[in-house]
A protein has these predicted regions:
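Active-site and adjacent substrate-binding regions of carbohydrate-active enzymes
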Residues: 1-172
Length: 172
């Protein structure tokens, strides 16, 4: 099963050896002084136990990317993902001043759940500004919504671009 491209490896976090090995890999790099980790598509790491195919997304535009043409009901935010993230965070908490950033493309009400109770991501990336209209009122409303949804102690963040998006200068 590949979420994005056949050449990109997928790990089966349901296999009993995978998570302990990943946590050991994290410790390896933390012992060497890295300040933390940016975890790509952290909300998609855990797959459906039955490896069911995703259903078509009835709301997808005809020219949508293949990823957006399906509804990720079996691979996005699957039950158990928060437990895995908590274990990753516990490893980071064994070290001083380390952090974990999670790449999560979700609406605010779902995004903020990845802070946990201060025991999951230090910062789930907030990508909402990337797709908002470049309008001060719309952006202001969103900022109020996002900051109002942050859990106590949650660090806000504002992503305007990344390797998956066109540069901001070409979007505004």
């Amino acid at each position: 099963m590949h979420q994005f491209h056949r050449a990109q490896p997928e790990l089966n976090y349901r296999h009993p050896d995978v998570l302990p090995a990943m946590l050991d890999n994290m410790r390896f790099w933390l012992d060497r002084g890295v300040d933390g980790f940016r975890v790509d598509v952290i909300w998609l790491m855990l797959k459906d136990e039955q490896f069911r195919d995703e259903p078509p997304n009835p709301h997808a535009a005809p020219d949508a990317r293949p990823f957006d043409q399906i509804s990720h009901v079996y691979t996005a935010g699957v039950e158990g993902i928060h437990d895995i993230i908590k274990q990753m965070r516990a490893v980071l908490d064994e070290y001083d001043e380390r952090m974990m950033v999670g790449e999560i493309y979700l609406p605010v009400e779902q995004l903020v759940t990845y802070y946990g109770d201060g025991d999951e991501c230090h910062m789930p990336f907030n990508f909402q500004l990337i797709n908002l209209p470049w309008d001060a009122r719309v952006i202001g409303d969103y900022i109020r919504e996002y900051e109002g949804a942050l859990p106590p102690g949650g660090w806000p963040n504002w992503v305007l671009g990344n390797h998956d998006q066109h540069r901001i200068a070409s979007r505004v």
